[in-house]
Amino acid sequence: MVPSLVAPAVATAAAGCHGNACEGRSPKATGCGSDAQTIPGTVTHPGSGLHPQVWLRYSKQCDAVWAQGEESNGWTIRVQLDGGASYDAPTVPSGSAFTSMVGAGHRHRVGVLDADGRWSYGAWRKGGI
């Protein structure tokens, strides 16, 4: 008997978009959220008290980023392209909220709209992790 040289198939999630083609699309619907990582140093904390945390998430397989916020009600989170589009999402009392994506190859930042109607932003950055 000859040993088999065929390896078992490994299931991988196929990304629904890549780079700029992800702009305006959902990280969940495209499968881009499956390999997402939080980019270090991108957490924004406006004010004090029970304010939402918002951070930048990056998908290597999709080369895209988006804003994600946790467990807060009545706030809006944003991912913004430098000189381009912004994508917003309302936060929710339980669970996480996320914006649509933008390609990671352009300068981008995350922000949160506070109760006084002011935006607080993280630093501009380009690329993934």
Spans of model-derived segments:
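Secretory targeting and sorting signals
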Residues: 1-12
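Post-signal peptide N-terminal regions of Sec-secreted extracellular proteins
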Residues: 12-129
